[in-house]
Amino acid sequence: MITTVQEISKWRNLCFIRMQSRKWYPVLKKTPLVADGRKIIKHADKVPHPGEIIHPFYQPTAIEQFTACATEYNPSLLDGKKIAPSLIKHPVSLKTILVDSKLKFDDIRGVNRWLMEFVARRQHQRNIVLTPASKSVRSFHVLHLSSTDIAKLRGLENVLSEIENTNDLQSRVESVNNELQNIFDRDSKQTRLFCEDILAYLIKNYGNSTENLILLINVTEMQLFSRLDQMKAMNIILYHILCKVEANENPPCSPTLVTALENLLAAINNRFFPGRCENSLHPIVIEQLLSYFIITGNLNESKNFLGHLIKKGILPEATIINRYLEAIDVHFDKSTKIFDIRSKFAFIADLAPIIENYGTIDLFKFLIPMCRHFDELCSLLNIIRKSNNAKQAVDSTLPIFIKKVLTFTKDPMINSGNLSTVFNIVSPIYGQNVPSEFVEKFILSFALQGNYTMMAHMIDTYKIKLSHKYQLQIIRALKNSERNHALKNTGAVGYNKEFKKYFIEKYLNCTEREALRP
């Protein structure tokens, strides 16, 4: 009972904190994406707001939604396990934190409303249309320098040659900058010689070495607060710098070059914007920066630029996305630890529209190991089933799906049910004529569960030829099943001794039968 004014005030403050913690604060760019796995955050036990969940492909099925809405006590999704990656506000520090949340409600009230908003958000992601960026680079290549203008740059070219062997970067930058200033002082206003054209010309013709490129990047930074007064000019210069970074492969990204380019980007932000400059960069330049940060292993910046492209309705190149996924795997060493999977989800949260509508085989292969619940796996498989390249994607990923199904539980009956679900999802893709190589993998997986009925059913239905080698594989799988599930389901239909005897006598040769005799 609340009896005092102090208790009432305390109760109101607590309610306010809880209400505040359920709001959505989209501050991904300012959020450390690698979470602190050593901290146990009790607030993650609360069901997050649908907008706080960053899972890019989980979609509860109609049956899951119905079950949640029809369960009076503790309705849940994903069995209420703490595996829903979420960005939430910490109730005390009010910092945005990355946690694995439980989708387990206290009671049935509000579940339907929560599901409607969650499903609506997923539908919005499915409806996002992305188009590749225009590859026209004409505006970057047209330099407004006449032969007369280029002749005026001879002094600048001579300075670049004279200081080539000078080790002092600062003095080299000052020498080039002084000569650049002399050109503008001598030049009449009628010729309209622009700083960005000169720098782009120099980068294109003299930026072939890492040292010269660093020099010209530093000169560009010095000119930011004098003659480079428009983002259009910076787009041109950045384009040529990043083209040279990509072309100069020995080495492509030395630490000094990385520092110089990042200092230039920071200076651009300070010069034109209070925060970040992505909104004013050309999509081609954003793609270049994305590739650059992927190469240098800067995942946070890679995520920022990738997310910005997607928000602008631009579909990044498949090769760039693949390199991004490879960089994530390298960073986490292809780990399947819970903490690492949670952090990996943060880095791919922006990919939801791509997963839904433009998924590639490499992307699907990356996502399968990240599933921690069978319902997640089904969501991903349903996305593949509806994709334009469904058959090719299933051909490449089905063996991985079958293997992954058996990792969620050790219960042979649940595993058998899950295997049957996967088989039923993919069968229509093949017109009910699933290739024998995949049917054989399903049979071996059912053998690992000791499910004689399903093995016999699939052998008969798909007329699988039981070669000597394949029979030995079945026997090894059945032996593993007997060791792993010795005390489970021995009396269940399809698993008991009578079915075992029937299967052995009908499907195995005499020489193979003895291997399974008690």
From Swiss-Prot:
Cellular localization per UniProt: Mitochondrion
Pfam families documented for this protein: AEP1
Cellular component terms per the entry's GO annotation: mitochondrion
UniProtKB keywords: Mitochondrion, Transit peptide, Translation regulation
Transit peptide (first-last residue): 1-19
Entry GO MF terms: translation regulator activity
Keyword GTP-binding: no
Keyword field contains Nucleus: no
Chief location: mitochondrion
Its job: Required for translation of the mitochondrial OLI1 transcript encoding subunit 9 of mitochondrial ATP synthase.
Family: Belongs to the AEP1 family.
Protein name: ATPase expression protein 1, mitochondrial
Lineage: Eukaryota, Fungi, Dikarya, Ascomycota, Saccharomycotina
Gene name of the record: AEP1
